């Protein structure tokens, strides 16, 4: 199944003036891919490694309930990314809209990109040189994690967080053993199984605990999802 993540709507179903942070756990969230009534353009990162970073950044945003939706405070996510260095580490209530969140994910992935909205997104992202030329999404399009989708006219933008494997994607290298002194760090699967049993508590506390323990919450959650299928 193809899954996309995005900043969607505030806690009252409005676009502006909501309370900072995700009040419903659905303001910034993942959902199954859907056909938009305005149609989608696809912007695919040229490098598989960059695509993976973009997709992971969006998962981090969807898991971090400090990030909510508000067009009037859309630059909050950008400012907090500069302050904390990573979306998963943002530790104060802030806001984003769909395009500023996509921008933040691209910045975290190492792409130098300025401001844009859904009207200018295609041209701005193409000019970075990090993406292939935009194409129209059809029924035959196989979407991959890290793909950026934006409506053909001003509307909405999302990032694919789960999808088909890229043809150029190499197998991920096995992680090196943790050389830190003391108790060995648990594997991601061990932690995922502990989360399922409730040992790590609930979000947002769980996310903070994972970060402090040296884990990337999005990677752990991906394993949790697989174990629960």
State what each model feature region is.
Residues 176, 213-229:
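Repeat-associated, polar segments at repeat-unit boundaries in modular proteins
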